Amino acid sequence: MRGAGPSPRQSPRTLRPDPGPAMSFFRRKVKGKEQEKTSDVKSIKASISVHSPQKSTKNHALLEAAGPSHVAINAISANMDSFSSSRTATLKKQPSHMEAAHFGDLGRSCLDYQTQETKSSLSKTLEQVLHDTIVLPYFIQFMELRRMEHLVKFWLEAESFHSTTWSRIRAHSLNTVKQSSLAEPVSPSKKHETTASFLTDSLDKRLEDSGSAQLFMTHSEGIDLNNRTNSTQNHLLLSQECDSAHSLRLEMARAGTHQVSMETQESSSTLTVASRNSPASPLKELSGKLMKSIEQDAVNTFTKYISPDAAKPIPITEAMRNDIIARICGEDGQVDPNCFVLAQSIVFSAMEQEHFSEFLRSHHFCKYQIEVLTSGTVYLADILFCESALFYFSEYMEKEDAVNILQFWLAADNFQSQLAAKKGQYDGQEAQNDAMILYDKYFSLQATHPLGFDDVVRLEIESNICREGGPLPNCFTTPLRQAWTTMEKVFLPGFLSSNLYYKYLNDLIHSVRGDEFLGGNVSLTAPGSVGPPDESHPGSSDSSASQSSVKKASIKILKNFDEAIIVDAASLDPESLYQRTYAGKMTFGRVSDLGQFIRESEPEPDVRKSKGSMFSQAMKKWVQGNTDEAQEELAWKIAKMIVSDIMQQAQYDQPLEKSTKL
């Protein structure tokens, strides 16, 4: 799917010809390998250091323009790799104030406690869902059930078009500069021709993968260019000026195609001679292909989602549609990369307001949460920034007598977040009073809930709170780091193997089962409500059978998963009290004034078990004595006598109370 991002298993060599949306992922992948140095030219081109923006820009330009000197590229890359490695080692060096002796009983601080850890994988925003390849398929499935999947797909394709278009425009600009430099009267170089042909082949391969290679046809296929251009223009309802611009650009493309095909033949035409003698010709053809791919992608997106005769058009106005047409067919003949940005914002708002809240409550999101919780890589941030998971974690911390650590972290983090949100525009005295509440509770020598911080941390907090102008938003950073590290290293592993964690999983699984049963019934009955009740469809039985089999298979998978984690439902589910094996059958009855349950309907005679003959019953009574029923009956008689005696005494004392009141 376009827009979902490149696959994590793609190698850097396959991503190298494309300088567009894969570059950000490529930089992340190369970050862990910045220490390695190879002699391969392609590997050195791909190894872009994330610590040096100048190096990243330069290598990006080299990838697009393909400079002639590979030796210079090797030298520059090696030097900047060594510089980045030394700078990274300096940054990773632990400062003097972060030594182990600085921290108290809560353990050593976590140096990775940064802003990126304030996000939980279990609670997502719509923007995070659209950029996360794990939860995005669940959201698409949810939208497919609502027949609104075209909104998600349009947003993804428009986002991909926006990023790739800017990268292609940058490549076009670099090739234009390179073409102007090569246009000077210099003797042709074989090295230039090899480099340009390599870039042309690489671009052709990338455009074939993205579905845009249909514009770059051979001479035999170039006959249908005018027909396809006319159909595209009619479908887009473009103006006459736009038609002329399209035809002009396509004629240029056909001329470039003729030029490429004729270069392979042994002819003496003027076009062939000019192509062989000018090293700028392949770069000019490359730039033309880049701009053609932008135009074709814009046309495809418009045809699928914005055109009036699209299968599932997005909800936009006619004025917005005309604006998009004007941006695609600009006066200068270029496509605006931001032509779909406004439509993206409309679609994003529609998904957020009408569908996303329901998705968070659906079993699709529960399935995603189960996948995260069972992946084996659950972090503390996933628990602390998710309300449902934080509830179970707080119960676990309370059982471990460490809930004060969690409460301090929540209170201090909330305090710092509120101060940071005000951006310095807050009352210093009020902030100091709030900070003193936390200090008196957790840090002072007379603290009500001491956490074990040492004197160094306590003095640091005192100086941060009592500063002139009030405390800063980072006044509790050091104890927050210690509390975070303690919960992460000491309590999180125990929580992930506790019964409360399995109860959390069990609740999610039960919610998925219930929603699947309800959703399955609705999906099976909804198609039948469209037509008359007596109308039968030949394929309805097959579809219902397939849907029921799929539902049973999914439930079986969840059942096996439930058994695999070994959840003791008797100790976790309160409803199990009503499912005891030794509990008697439920019967109708009433409770008397004395608290005795009196049955209103006795079981049928044949249901009662045979107690044997009269002789056997007499022998049992003689051997065992009175039965339980007889003893219970005698106890009720005694209770009635006691209650009646008390009632008589109360009625006897009642006239005296009335006389005293009078």
UniProtKB/Swiss-Prot annotation:
Coiled-coil residue windows: none
Pfam families in the cross-refs: RGS
Biased composition (Polar residues): 261-280
Segment annotated as transit peptide: 1-28
Region (PKA-RII subunit binding) residue spans: 634-647
DNA damage listed as a keyword: no
UniProt-listed GO biological process terms: protein localization; signal transduction
Region (Disordered): 1-55, 261-282, 524-548
Composition skew (Basic and acidic residues), residue ranges: 32-43
Domain RGS residues, every copy: 125-369, 379-505
GO molecular function: protein kinase A binding
Database matches in InterPro entries: AKAP10_AKB_dom, Cell_Polariz_PKAAnc, RGS, RGS_sf, RGS_subdomain_2
Keywords: Cytoplasm, Membrane, Mitochondrion, Phosphoprotein, Repeat, Transit peptide
Subcellular location field: Mitochondrion; Membrane; Cytoplasm
SUPFAM superfamilies membership: Regulator of G-protein signaling, RGS
Domain notes from UniProt: RII-alpha binding site, predicted to form an amphipathic helix, could participate in protein-protein interactions with a complementary surface on the R-subunit dimer.
PANTHER family hit by this protein: A-KINASE ANCHOR PROTEIN 10, MITOCHONDRIAL, A-KINASE ANCHOR PROTEINS
Protein name: A-kinase anchor protein 10, mitochondrial
